[in-house]
Amino acid sequence: MAIENNNNGVNFCTVKRPKTKIVCTLGPASRSVPMIEKLLRAGMNVARFNFSHGSHDYHQETIDNLRQAMESTGILCAVMLDTKGPEIRTGFLKDAKPVQLKQGQEITISTDYSIKGDESMICMSYKKLAEDVKPQSVILCADGQITFTVLSCDKENGLDRCRCENTAVLGERKNVNLPGVIVDLPTLTDKDKDDILNWGVPNHIDMIALSFVRKGSDLVEVRKLLGEHAKNILLMSKVENQEGVANFDDILLNSDAFMVARGDLGMEIPIEKIFLAQKVMIYKCNIQGKPVVTATQMLESMIKSPRPTRAEATDVANAVLDGTDCVMLSGETAAGAYPDLAVGTMAKICIEAESTIDYPDVFKRIMSNAPVPMSPLESLASSAVRTANSAKAALILVLTRGGSTAKLVAKYRPGMPILSVVVPEIKTDSFDWTCSDESPARHSLIFRGLVPVLHAGSARASHEESTEEALDFALQHAKTKGLCKQGDSVVALHRVGTASVIKIVTVK
């Protein structure tokens, strides 16, 4: 069995990479340097740090290990901080013993979080619970495994009398959802602010996944909090309740990226409508050219099993066909028995799904929704994709400084990979040469089809010389990575002086 697993690990290193990006949650099963190296080789593009669990020191150790693994493998990986957000949780229990609940049993829920719960009373962390729910409201616990129906509310004492609708065991500190209730909690808690400013910013994170975003103004607040760091950190919104769904367009407008977080969303809207919410959200993100991550339970059974269920394999493929930029693994990599196998399996499914897409048709659909008039840069990017599709090019090559041109090319979903050659800006005063940081390269790791590569360039070369040098470097790099071979056509997009040029080059 061990030999078989090792073989799988080796195969996954040699297969080609999918265009769809893979986000992996790092946790107890995957935070050692050797395991992170395996994940990087298997196809991890973004490492997710889930701040619902773990201390700053714990996450610091993990990110230090990630940097070491990146250094030893030479594989670039972006860092995502996922905020805990304004969660409501059940409290602690007497002697830490799980409580056995029976169907039809009545129980009191208190908002006094110091209470140690038992069969007759438990507590929840939301102070306004008794005010915001009403008789017949539903309270869901432990990812929806336990359902309570509210019978009566005592607002003065903060107590709700409830009936348990199913037999189940309740452990300590389980998450709580209140479907249809507009909850009076801030999007960013004090803990989130501390995590972002005292861990995220010093560690130069690339993106923040914001839990429970409810309106566009929430993102304005986060940008204010980040101040000068906002330009280097992408904000990815997670819509996880009905208020967020209602304000989706406003939220997307103010976000850099989006996550379809199906876990909490599945508690808030009827489970049979999740597929539609996913498709609509992904479609809207695609039209706006904003990267979108599909998350939650994608290969859930691989936490324990070396093979996913057929339904899971189909789910991953369908997310790719829907147009997702990234697919995400949570417990599968954080606490599962087969972290690297889960990544490799996901990569294989994505490659297979991508091979069935009608790319010219996708291009037409995005073009028909493109802004009028189009910005010169977007017009150029879409023309590069049209040229590459017609010329049956093996690769699109974009020389970029800030990465925005390459991202616009990715919006038009070419059938071939896009090599985004990030040429750091050389800033000079009379004493010193400095390069801008590599965050544009890491940011592009959440765009489908974008392959970033850093090119140091020669500080003293003229613009034309450095452009030619960067093009030669990029073509050589693409050949070694197997993105193109001798005789292939490559569409190159770059600047010459003040003009931008699209040209077709043949790989020598």
Curated annotation (Swiss-Prot):
- List the InterPro entries hit by this protein, alphabetically: Pyr_Knase, Pyrv/PenolPyrv_kinase-like_dom, Pyrv_kinase-like_dom_sf, Pyrv_Knase-like_insert_dom_sf, Pyrv_Knase_AS, Pyrv_Knase_brl, Pyrv_Knase_C, Pyrv_Knase_C_sf
SUPFAM superfamilies named among the record's database cross-references: Phosphoenolpyruvate/pyruvate domain, PK beta-barrel domain-like, PK C-terminal domain-like
> EC number(s) of the enzyme?
2.7.1.40
Which Pfam families does this one have?
A: PK, PK_C
Subcellular location, record wording: Cytoplasm
- Looking at the UniProt record, the site noted as Transition state stabilizer sits at 238
Lineage: superkingdom: Eukaryota
Which family does the entry's similarity section mention?
Belongs to the pyruvate kinase family.
Indicate the quaternary assembly.
Homotetramer.
Question: What is this protein called in UniProt?
Answer: Pyruvate kinase, cytosolic isozyme
